[in-house]
């Protein structure tokens, strides 16, 4: 009996160590996941769900967050819970979160990141739409739904002011607009359930 418990404890310990290593590796190599720990990172100053690397930028970040949140909710419904958003005003902060060339990035429904060039309402609304998509469809479905639906919806409903987007985003925005006109359901999430 003692030997049996010893084996169970060893297996449990191996599983725990494996999971701990997996979490550590994910945290190191997939930098955007760090948004989960935004409130605990010393380089950030958080007020509610808005985190900034420079405290002087907090008022502007809060204004952008609140405006984009309201606009997004008007277009795609209320959030299940208000997302955490990290606003980086320096390239160093953006690099900490693995932003690379992105202006902003939604990390599923875990949080959002905004790089220095992304401090514009349409970028933030675009990423909040992705956050809502992840809330409604799930994080895995964000990878399996058609790109024209995922990206087209975000570009179209965020009122991105650029008349022409790069390939393939321009086509995806146009395809979504056409689909949306043909499927005028007041509950956009109900309408998108049918799209595979």
Where are the regions a protein language model picked out?
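Auxiliary, metal-adjacent structural segments of Zn-dependent hydrolase domains
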Residues: 52-108, 117
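Active-site recognition of the HExxH zinc-binding catalytic motif
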Residues: 122-135, 154-155
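Pan-zinc metallopeptidase signature
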Residues: 2-39, 169-196
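Post-HExxH zinc-binding segment in Zn-dependent metallohydrolases
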Residues: 143-179
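Stable alpha-helical elements in mature extracytoplasmic
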Residues: 61-68, 120, 124, 149-153, ...
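Catalytic toxin/effector domains delivered as secreted proteins or via bacterial secretion systems
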Residues: 135, 139, 166-167
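Short pre-active-site segment immediately N-terminal to the catalytic Zn-binding motif
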Residues: 108-125, 139-146
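Short extracytoplasmic/periplasmic juxtamembrane "stem" segments immediately C-terminal to an N-terminal membrane anchor
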Residues: 38-60
């Amino acid at each position: 009996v003692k030997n049996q418990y010893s084996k169970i404890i060893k297996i449990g310990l191996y599983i725990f160590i494996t999971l701990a290593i997996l979490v550590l590796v994910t945290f190191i190599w997939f930098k955007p996941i760090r948004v989960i720990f935004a409130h605990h990172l010393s380089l950030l100053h958080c007020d509610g769900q808005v985190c900034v690397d420079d405290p002087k930028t907090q008022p502007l970040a809060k204004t952008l967050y609140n405006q984009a949140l309201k606009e997004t909710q008007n277009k795609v419904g209320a959030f299940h819970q208000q997302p955490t958003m990290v606003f980086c005003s320096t390239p160093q902060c953006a690099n900490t979160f693995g932003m690379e060339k992105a202006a902003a990035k939604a990390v599923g429904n875990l949080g959002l990141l905004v790089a220095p060039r992304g401090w514009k309402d349409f970028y933030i609304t675009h990423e909040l739409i992705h956050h809502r998509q992840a809330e409604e469809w799930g994080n895995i479905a964000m990878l399996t739904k058609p790109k024209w639906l995922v990206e087209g919806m975000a570009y179209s409903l965020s009122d991105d002011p650029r008349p022409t987007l790069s390939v393939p985003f321009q086509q995806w925005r146009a395809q979504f607009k056409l689909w949306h006109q043909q499927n005028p359901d007041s509950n956009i999430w109900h309408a998108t359930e049918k799209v595979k």
